[in-house]
Amino acid sequence: MIPRSRVLFKHLGTRPRVIAPVLMGQMARPTISIGDALAAAPGGSGNLLALVEIHAGRDNGVFAQEQRRRDMLRWVAGLEYASDVRRRLSVTLRMTANLASSIRDAVVESEATSLVLEWPTTASPRRHGLSDLTRQLLPDRVTDIAFVRSNNPNQAITPRSILASIRGGASSRVVASTAAMLADAYGSALTLVHIQTDLQHPDRSRREWESFEQIVEELQRPSTMVRLHRHDNPAGGILEEAAGHDLVIIGSRLSPSNPNVLVGRELLRMVRRLDCPVVMVRPKHVSQSEPAYPIARNGHRA
């Protein structure tokens, strides 16, 4: 564990403008609590975008639409939660026949820097609609996206201890800055872990470790704890490190050739075994030079 000194970290200097879109009936409270925390950063702001769905040819009269608006407002009001983090998301109601288009409009209007979306489990009542919405939004690459996954839909996320897995590279800076913003908002202890594996080429392992060290130095958080964990399986290493933490933050898979695949099978299996909530961060920019898979010692993909 290595304490670090304060230096400049440019990503943390930006003012976050957060949008948390929600659909009626989804597991919204964990997602909203993360949105509030991200918007609590200095100069930050946020919007809870309540999307009232209009289906062509079904109950589209004025009375029916007004009833759906009232139902949505009551549902959103019922999502209030107790927390030391002050509520930062203002509520905007939008009637829409195209969810993705309405979110894109809201992003442009508010100049949003981050979207916060539910990462649905198999128990999520709106999982099919949310998965389809995610597929439509991923190609845009206009904002960073934080995907929030929790096994307790009725409980806001209020972690005392946060673990963030940092690989190294440009995308990892967004993961690290997101973790730092959440830790600052919640007053949480923050641990950054770097998982090393023998499966990839030693030169790449060295570059990633040097990048990780630089990211830690740039974070400007002397209280941040740092760990190096060696494991033959990165997902297994994260699972072991996650014990005792209340929130785990990971980066999404970054594959220019297949940008819609956010997480590999092994990592997804690991996430399903975690007892605590998970935030997966997908940066808006995908590096064209970053391989989608680790490079093994023999020069081939592992």
Predicted regions, residues:
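A short, acidic, amphipathic alpha-helical segment used as a generic capping/interface helix at domain edges
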Residues: 210-214, 230-242
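Conserved active-site histidine-acidic residue motif and adjacent donor-binding/catalytic loop
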Residues: 94-100, 229-235
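Small/aliphatic-rich secondary-structure junction motif
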Residues: 7-74, 80-92, 158-228, 247, ...
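Gly/Ser-rich helix-loop-strand patches that form or flank binding pockets
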Residues: 1, 32-34, 106-155, 239-302
